[in-house]
C-alpha cells in the first residue's frame, strides 16, 4: 500500500511518527498502533486479552440495552485493533453500528481501514459521516486530510490538516503532516512555514526532534 510504504519511510526517522494518532475516543488507544505495528509488550497484551475475554463473557450472558451492548462491542473492537487483529476489530465495530448507528468513533475506525485498503471514495464517505455525527471529532481532520493527500487533492487536504494543526499548534506531528502536504501543494512556501511553526513547539515533545531533522538541524 502507498500509505504503508509512506509510513515505513517515515519510520526510519521515528518508529512512531504516527504516534499523534488517527483515532480519537475516550481512551485513545491505540492511536500509535493503528497504522504502524501492534504493541509488543507482553504484559500489555495479557491485560488486553483478559479484557477481551471478560467483555465476551458479558456479551454472552449479560442483559443490557442496545446502547450498552454497542459500547461493549466498540471497546472490544478497540482492544482487537490495538493487538493488530483488524478483522476481529472490524467485526465488532460493525456489530456496534448495527446496534447504535450514530457512533462517530466507529465510523472513524472503519474509515481508517478503508483508507488502508486504498478505497478512497468509501473512506471519504465514512469520514464525512463522522463529521455529520460529531463536527468536533478532531482526528478525523487528519484522517480525511490523508485521504485527500493520497488522491492528490492537496488543496482539500490542506483545509483538513490546517484545522488539525490549529487544534493543537504545539503538537509536532500535526506540524509535520501539514508540512508534508504543503510540499506537494506549495513547495516554495513549505519550508518557511515549517520554520515558523516550529517556533511554537515544545522541546518536551520527542517529535520536535523530527521537525528539527526536517529543518536540517
Predicted features and spans:
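Canonical tetratricopeptide repeat
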Residues: 75, 108-109, 143, 177
Amino acid at each position: 500500500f502507498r500509505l504503508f510504504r509512506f509510513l515505513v519511510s517515515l519510520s526510519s526517522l521515528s518508529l512512531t511518527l504516527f504516534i499523534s494518532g488517527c483515532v480519537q475516543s475516550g481512551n485513545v488507544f491505540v492511536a500509535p498502533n493503528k497504522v504502524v505495528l501492534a504493541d509488543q509488550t507482553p504484559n500489555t497484551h495479557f491485560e488486553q486479552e483478559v479484557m477481551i475475554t471478560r467483555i465476551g463473557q458479558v456479551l454472552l450472558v449479560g442483559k443490557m440495552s442496545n446502547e450498552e451492548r454497542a459500547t461493549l462491542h466498540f471497546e472490544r473492537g478497540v482492544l482487537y485493533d490495538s493487538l493488530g487483529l483488524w478483522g476481529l476489530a472490524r467485526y465488532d465495530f460493525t456489530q456496534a453500528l448495527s446496534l447504535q448507528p450514530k457512533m462517530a468513533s466507529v465510523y472513524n475506525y472503519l474509515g481508517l481501514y478503508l483508507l488502508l485498503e486504498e478505497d478512497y471514495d468509501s473512506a471519504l464517505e465514512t469520514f464525512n459521516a463522522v463529521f455529520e455525527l460529531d463536527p468536533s471529532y478532531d482526528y478525523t481532520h487528519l484522517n480525511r486530510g490523508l485521504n485527500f493527500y493520497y488522491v492528490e487533492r492537496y488543496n482539500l487536504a490542506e483545509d483538513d490538516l490546517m484545522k488539525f494543526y490549529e487544534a493543537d499548534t504545539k503538537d509536532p506531528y500535526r506540524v509535520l503532516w501539514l508540512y508534508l502536504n504543503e510540499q506537494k501543494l506549495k513547495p516554495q512556501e513549505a519550508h518557511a512555514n515549517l520554520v515558523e511553526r516550529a517556533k511554537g513547539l515544545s522541546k518536551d515533545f520527542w517529535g520536535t526532534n523530527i521537525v528539527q531533522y526536517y529543518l536540517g538541524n
